[in-house]
UniProtKB/Swiss-Prot annotation:
Record's protein name: 1-deoxy-D-xylulose-5-phosphate synthase
Protein's UniProt keywords contain Cell membrane: no
PROSITE patterns on file: TRANSKETOLASE_1, TRANSKETOLASE_2
Cofactor binding remark: Binds 1 Mg(2+) ion per subunit. Binds 1 thiamine pyrophosphate per subunit.
Species this chain originates from: Exiguobacterium sibiricum (strain DSM 17290 / CCUG 55495 / CIP 109462 / JCM 13490 / 255-15)
Catalytic activity, as annotated: D-glyceraldehyde 3-phosphate + pyruvate + H(+) = 1-deoxy-D-xylulose 5-phosphate + CO2
Role noted for this protein: Catalyzes the acyloin condensation reaction between C atoms 2 and 3 of pyruvate and glyceraldehyde 3-phosphate to yield 1-deoxy-D-xylulose-5-phosphate (DXP).
One GO BP: isopentenyl diphosphate biosynthetic process, methylerythritol 4-phosphate pathway
UniProt family annotation: Belongs to the transketolase family. DXPS subfamily.
Regions that span the bilayer: none
Domain of life: Bacteria
Alphabetical list of SMART domains matching this protein: Transket_pyr
Residues noted as binding Mg(2+) in the record, renumbered to the chain: D144, N173
Length: 628
């Protein structure tokens, strides 16, 4: 059967193991060939081919519900549920989503993109099944990296306590994006090296029965002995102690073993955990031997050489600029530390880690812990910097409010991927952080217009004593010359980038360049003043009051949600001053922005410079007509 002819996974039940093994090879070749053109999460999916085949063979989706943690490893699931023909549109505008999507298929029952949510969702599904009186199964597939997340551990505790019918498939590949860290990872390593617990139990019972005369009595009273043996085989028996029936570890690329174990698992009552050992990138050498996470998610590549196809770089990335600046500062300040929740690769932190390993802390997928860990350091006079993606910072909101800002602690947040990120879609767009930070007392929020200003703004932010967030976008800088010496710049004032008399556009970050383009497009018709409003909080009240007094129409521009955003702050300030300027706001509307190219998404919501220019022209002309 051609992969593009698949309608649903029911055909798998008619296939022999040898046929499934050949089919697994077809799927791997398909993924390698398709993603070479589109890019995507290659390594995670190559690692779960056999596991996904076995799951769909032994269970009955969509009656039995598969809940994929994070979701980037669901490509094989998508192929088996009739979407192979859409892979040429993967992660593209209006195309196939790179994560499970409920409106794509009845087989996608849970949408995700952030980690550690699957166990809680699966328990919710299992409870609902029980209340409705059906015997459908809830199966959560979670990686060993995601299992380190606090939410996953909370769910393990609850599922075990309630003895809920949840099947947990632990996909253990020793990596999340990069290699995993922490005590949970070390414990799983000890389990990997042990013998299989269930097999050991069976062998123990057989041996006891064979003991002459007393074998039968020992078998009846041998529970303590069996538990002692299990404890010796698997240190701590962590999952069994939490109330789970533990199976494994099993080779995640051995279909015979997988199918056998899944048959045991689906007959169990109560919570079950099947520990599956997989190889991330299995079947494609560059991905299989990737030790740092390059092949976790990437753009197009050359299949033969494994070379990632990149355009000519015109400037260092914003992430590199931040990491490089922090490394330079750490040479002069031995109190500066750097904390990341498992995003050291994406945020280019290797230069800092290489030079200052003792001051670099990768806490794993644990955003809440990362922020409060930083707060604890700050109470002792250290200068912690938390490097975190905008979308993942959402997970540490209470820690920001309660532990950092309330105590006015000296913690710097470098907010990576601020703004639209494109192909990863609605779960990853960095558009909410301004709105959820702006109303928190004590914290400052800043964003530079380019990579050169970014290094100085970050330098100033770290020097500042108190909580401060430095936002910066994904991708390369704009190619401006970089100053060799760092210096402080104001964290309270804005700059006029271009003079104008008809309208003033206030923008920050990359949107300053957009505002300058808008001014050029309107030149000769509308005289546009462009203001670099790099301090989002606090506002430059002196400049704003001068603008109110002048009576010039105001435009705010932000690649963030309008509700509660920068434009809202300007309106609030004007109201407080009893000033009533004409204000037009541009930003992200009140809906989730899906996946696609950034420019395609900006066009869809009307935020390209040409689109804004026409709106500004109308806004200014309307004001002129009203004043006549």
């Amino acid at each position: 059967m051609k992969l593009t002819e698949i309608q649903d996974p029911s055909f798998l039940k008619r296939m022999s193991v040898s046929e499934l093994e050949l089919f697994a090879g077809d799927i791997r070749r398909f993924l390698i060939e398709e993603l070479a053109t589109t890019g995507g999460h290659l390594a995670p999916n190559l690692g779960v081919v056999e596991l996904t085949l076995a799951l769909h063979r032994e269970f009955d989706s969509p009656n039995d519900k598969f809940v994929w943690d994070v979701g980037h490893q669901a490509y094989v699931h998508k192929i088996l549920t009739g979407r192979a023909g859409q892979f040429d549109t993967l992660r593209q505008h209006k195309g196939l989503c790179g994560f499970p999507k409920r409106n794509e298929s009845v087989h996608d029952v849970w949408e995700t993109g952030h980690s550690s949510t699957s166990l809680s969702a699966a328990m919710g599904i299992a409870v609902s099944n029980e209340l409705k009186g059906n015997d459908d199964r809830a199966i959560a597939i979670i990686g060993d990296g995601a299992l380190t997340g606090g939410m996953a551990l909370e769910a393990l505790n609850h599922i075990g306590a309630e003895q809920q019918n949840v099947i947990v498939i632990l996909n253990d590949n020793e990596m999340s994006i990069a290699p995993n860290v922490g005590a949970m990872h070390q414990m799983l390593g000890r389990i990997r090296s042990s013998r299989k617990v269930r097999y050991a139990q069976d062998e123990l019972e057989t041996l006891i029965k064979k003991i002459p005369l007393i074998g039968g009595k020992l078998e009846k009273g041998g529970e303590k002995l069996k538990e002692a043996v299990k404890g010796a085989l698997v240190p701590g028996m962590f999952f069994e102690e939490l109330g789970f029936n533990y199976y494994g570890p099993v080779d995640g690329h051995d279909l015979t073993d997988l199918i056998e174990q899944l048959n045991y698992v689906k007959k169990e009552e109560g919570p079950v955990l099947l520990h599956v050992i997989t190889k991330k990138g299995k079947g494609y050498r560059p991905a299989e031997y990737d030790g740092i996470g390059t092949w976790h998610g990437l753009g197009p590549y050359k299949i033969e050489s494994g070379e990632v196809i990149k355009g000519k770089s015109k400037a260092p990335s914003y992430s590199f600029t931040v990491a490089d600046t922090l490394t330079k500062m750490a040479r002069e300040d031995d109190k500066l530390t750097l904390i990341t929740p498992a995003m050291s690769v994406g945020s280019k932190l290797d230069c800092f880690e290489k030079e200052f390993p003792e001051r670099m802390f990768d806490v794993g997928i644990a955003e809440q812990h990362a922020v409060t860990f930083a707060a604890g350091q700050a109470t002792q006079g250290m200068k912690p910097v938390v490097s975190i993606y905008s979308t993942f910072f959402q997970r540490a909101y209470d820690q920001l409010v309660h532990d950092v800002a309330r105590q006015n602690l000296d913690v710097t947040f470098t907010i990576d991927r601020s703004g639209l990120v494109g192909a990863d879609g609605e779960t990853h767009q960095g558009v909410f952080d301004i709105a959820f930070m702006r109303h928190v007392p004590n914290i400052r929020i800043v964003m530079a217009k380019d990579e050169n200003e970014l290094q100085h703004l970050l330098y100033s932010a770290v020097k500042y004593e108190g909580p401060i967030a430095v936002r910066f976008p994904r991708g390369e800088g704009i190619g401006v010359p970089m100053d060799e010496t760092l210096h402080e710049i104001s964290l309270d004032t804005w700059d006029v980038e271009r003079e104008g008399t008809d309208v003033a556009i206030m923008a920050f970050g990359p949107q300053v360049q957009d505002a300058l383009k808008i001014a050029e497009l309107l030149e000769g018709d509308v005289s546009v003043r462009v203001i670099n409003a790099r301090t989002i909080k606090p506002l430059d009240e002196k400049m704003l009051n001068a603008l109110y007094a002048e009576g010039i129409p105001l435009v705010t521009l932000e690649e963030a949600v309008l509700k509660g955003g920068f434009g809202s702050a300007v309106l609030e300030h004007a109201n407080e001053q009893e000033a009533f300027p004409r204000v037009k706001r541009f930003g992200i509307p009140d809906w989730y922005i899906e996946h696609g190219g950034v420019n395609e998404l900006l066009e869809e919501i009307g935020l390209l410079p040409g689109q804004i220019a026409e709106e500004v022209r109308s806004f200014v002309n309307q004001g002129k007509k009203q004043s006549v």
